[in-house]
Each structure stands twice: as structure tokens, then as C-alpha cells.
Amino acid sequence: MAELQEVQITEEKPLLPGQTPETAKEAELAARILLDQGQTHSVETPYGSVTFTVYGTPKPKRPAIFTYHDVGLNYKSCFQPLFRFGDMQEIIQNFVRVHVDAPGMEEGAPVFPLGYQYPSLDQLADMIPCILQYLNFSTIIGVGVGAGAYILSRYALNHPDTVEGLVLINIDPNAKGWMDWAAHKLTGLTSSIPDMILGHLFSQEELSGNSELIQKYRGIIQHAPNLENIELYWNSYNNRRDLNFERGGETTLKCPVMLVVGDQAPHEDAVVECNSKLDPTQTSFLKMADSGGQPQLTQPGKLTEAFKYFLQGMGYMASSCMTRLSRSRTASLTSAASIDGSRSRSRTLSQSSESGTLPSGPPGHTMEVSC
């Protein structure tokens, strides 16, 4: 019989002095919670302090995903349903994320004093270089909604070399005209600030339906302790300048762009017009059926798939698993061969290209997808 030998087994991760297995598990859980919550920073800029939260660690030769939220929201209420969606984890594990809160919109923000001059949207865009310098990040992929989409677009116009791509949801690149101002003033006489902001965020059909989502966000805005700050951000949005996009001109976005809007959303016409002004070789247009005014809240799965395609076209996520939009495309191409036009809008795909396929490389044409 072979002689038994004593074998000493040591832990792969030895416990700290005085640490029990139970406390080690608690420490590991606390670390995971901290990682999930991100790290919040504030930086001073020429236009005041701005707060942002960083998730993950920088990846070599990869840009940061950089988000900016809409009026009435902060980064959590605007983007958490999207970035916590299951299929999105494949993306976020490959990129560091920076979520910006507009001044005074972060959780626990004090109310600005009476007479405080809130930054314009152009000035909010001018804060972004201070954030990137603080983090030592050189390039970003921007994801913005509403006012945030405008801010990121303004930044991209001023600093094109630092923006690799933009996902712009509900962007309105135009300044308010006289008719818009008159309607806004008239609405202000009969509606509260929360009601006006809700009308900006959601369609009338959604507001009339009063779903759980609408009830949730109505409560968030109506009972916000920083409602005065929200009104200042709202006023800055309504005083925005025209971005003056011009197809074929000097004033245009130089990076790949994905425009996103919900079918019958409040900003559908504005996004369609924006699409007509951008470079068709760099722009894709995603119109999402049954998503309402905030597709990142109501259809995070479809938007995640579109985002994966967008990143793949930029040379990232090449081996990513595409599912929902792939099935939608297959059904659409089958539908296109049929005379029957009664098929659901959620299964249609139309492109200005005659290839009949989604681009696998950088965007080469304007495409419109209803999914």
C-alpha cells in the first residue's frame, strides 16, 4: 500500500487577521454593492460644479460610454432601466461608463438660491471637457435623451475629435420659434411645471393611459425636493439655440450617429427633421413602435439590441450575440416580399439603401428601423 502523505491546503484568498469567513463574505458583498453603485465625483467648472458617477474601469483603446439625461430626470431615473437590463451587461462589461447629472439634479442636491443663474445648454456642454480632463479620458460614445441629447450634440460640434459616436434619443436641434414660445407661455398659464415636463417626456396617449410607469414618474417629478432646480434646467432647455445642422455643410456631426424616437412620441417630428439634416453616410434612424416618449424606459431590450448593432458598426462588440433585431429583420424582409401591408409596424424595416441588410461596418447610409 502506498504511503499516505500529508498535504497542506491553503486558501486561494487568505482571510485578513481577525477575519472570519462570515465577515469576509460581508466584505465581498459590500464591495460588489459599491461597484454596482459606482463612484460619484464632483468637479468645478467655469459654470459651477457638476456631479457624475463612474461605473467600471477604463478599458485600453476603448472610449467611455458617457450619458446625459433629460429635464425632470437624473441619471438614475433616466438610464437605470436600460443599463440594468440583462442583455446590456454584455456591453457595460466592455466599457467604462460616466453618467452625468446636470447641476442641481443629483440626488440630495440643495435648492439653488433665489436669483441663481443656471447654465445654458451650451454652457452645460462646455462643462464636459472638465469632466474628461478630471478622469483623463480622451474619447467618448455619448448617449443622451432630450436636453441631454442636445448637450452632447453641442459638445460634439465643438470637440469632434473626442466623440467616437452618439446615440441621440428625442433630440430637438431647433430653437423655439415664435409659435412655440406663444404655445409655451399659454400652457404655462394653465399648467404646472410638473405637468409641462411630463408632456415633454411622454406622449398624450401615455399620460391619458396613466400606466404604472406614468404614475411613477409623475410622482418623482411632482414630489421632487429640488423642483426649483428642475424648473431652471427646463428654462435653459426652452432657451436653447439652434444647432444649425446642415447636411453637406460645416455644421454637422462628424461621428456615427444613431437617432432614436418612439412612434408618436412628442419629439417624433423634430427627430425626423434632424435626420434629414445629418450626413446620411454616418446616420441611422431608429423609430420604435409601442415605446412612447421614453424608449430607454419602455423598450430597453430593443434599444440594447440596436445599441449593440451601433457599436458593432463602429468596430466594437464584433462577436456580440444579436437576437431581437435579427429576428425582426428576418421577418421584415419576408414581409417586404409580400403584398400584404397589414403586418404589424413592429415588424417593419425600411432603408434608403437597396441592399436589404443592416450594415455590419460603419454606417453607410441613412436607415429607418421600426421595431
UniProtKB/Swiss-Prot annotation:
- Keyword vocabulary terms for this entry: Acetylation, Cell projection, Cytoplasm, Developmental protein, Differentiation, Neurogenesis, Phosphoprotein, Tumor suppressor, Wnt signaling pathway
Q: Which family does it belong to?
A: Belongs to the NDRG family.
**Where does it reside?**
Cytoplasm; Cytoplasm, Perinuclear region; Cell projection, Growth cone
Name of the protein described by the UniProt record: Protein NDRG2
| One Pfam family this sequence matches | Ndr
Question: Where does the record place the modification Phosphoserine?
Answer: 326, 328, 332, 335, 338, 344, 350, 352-353, 355, 370
Function recorded in the entry: Contributes to the regulation of the Wnt signaling pathway. Down-regulates CTNNB1-mediated transcriptional activation of target genes, such as CCND1, and may thereby act as tumor suppressor. May be involved in dendritic cell and neuron differentiation.
PANTHER family from the entry?
N-MYC DOWNSTREAM REGULATED
**Could you give the subunit structure recorded for this chain?**
Interacts with CTNNB1.
> What's a GO cellular component annotated to this UniProt protein?
cytoplasm
Tissue note? Expressed at highest levels in brain, heart and liver, and at lower levels in kidney, colon, skeletal muscle, adrenal gland, ovary and uterus (at protein level).
User: Where is the stretch described as Disordered?
Assistant: 1-22, 334-371
- List every position bearing Phosphothreonine: 20, 330, 334, 348, 357
Q: Give all N-acetylalanine modified positions.
A: 2
Annotated GO biological processes are:
cell differentiation; negative regulation of cytokine production; negative regulation of ERK1 and ERK2 cascade; negative regulation of vascular associated smooth muscle cell proliferation; nervous system development; regulation of platelet-derived growth factor production; regulation of vascular endothelial growth factor production; vascular associated smooth muscle cell proliferation
